[in-house]
């Protein structure tokens, strides 16, 4: 996938060149970790926890019993801490959560699992991913992203590793932190799903050749 800050025919180094999407995930890391923790502590879905965080930041979610959201009211201890954290991130760091960025949560869970159990594997936030055939690349585009390109060459500085990206597609609106964690374990362990979408993670140099 060619990002807005990338050009065909230019050689990039994954260690030095980070896509805007990955930069934003890194910027929001602490905030998204707080959302994950709230889901883990309460058992509510990650989407519900994220939406609650959005409402806290935009001022429609309050702590008072008569005005507070039912999520906060049902979990007074964890909810109060979560409320305070979201307000602090918003006020001090000028962070706002947006609905279209909810998928960033999945990347945070994936990276957390990698750091805890699979440190020897390449980070999705500090490597590039590509597909070894056009079929998988086009299947990826069906999930909302286009602008697919063929990679002319990849010069890895470590061994390339294959993973099944279809594990991400198993996440539902009702999935909580623990459930998504199990999906991430399936991904990092190298297990394949019936409808596998094989991607390769690699750190090193890469160059885009042409648009498909």
What is each of the regions a protein language model found here?
Residues 2-103, 124-126, 135-148, 155-212:
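Conserved NAD+-utilizing ADP-ribose enzyme module
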Residues 102-125:
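Short linear interaction motifs
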């Amino acid at each position: 996938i060619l990002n807005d800050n990338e050009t065909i025919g230019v050689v990039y180094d994954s260690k030095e060149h980070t896509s805007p999407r990955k930069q934003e995930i890194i910027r929001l890391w602490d905030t998204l970790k707080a959302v994950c923790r709230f889901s883990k502590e309460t058992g509510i879905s990650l989407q519900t926890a994220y939406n609650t965080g959005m409402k806290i930041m935009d001022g429609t979610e309050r702590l008072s019993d008569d005005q507070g959201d039912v999520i906060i009211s049902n979990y007074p201890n964890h909810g109060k801490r979560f409320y305070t954290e979201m307000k602090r991130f918003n006020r001090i760091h000028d962070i706002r959560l947006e609905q279209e960025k909810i998928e960033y949560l999945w990347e945070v869970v994936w990276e957390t699992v990698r750091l805890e159990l699979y440190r020897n594997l390449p980070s999705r936030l500090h490597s590039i991913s590509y597909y070894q055939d056009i079929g998988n690349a086009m299947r990826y585009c069906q999930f909302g992203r286009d602008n697919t390109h063929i990679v002319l060459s990849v010069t890895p500085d470590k061994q390339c590793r294959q993973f099944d990206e279809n594990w991400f597609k198993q996440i539902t609106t009702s999935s909580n932190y623990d459930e998504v964690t199990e999906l991430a374990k399936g991904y990092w362990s190298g297990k394949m799903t019936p409808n596998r979408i094989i991607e390769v993670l690699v750190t090193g140099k890469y160059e885009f050749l042409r648009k498909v």
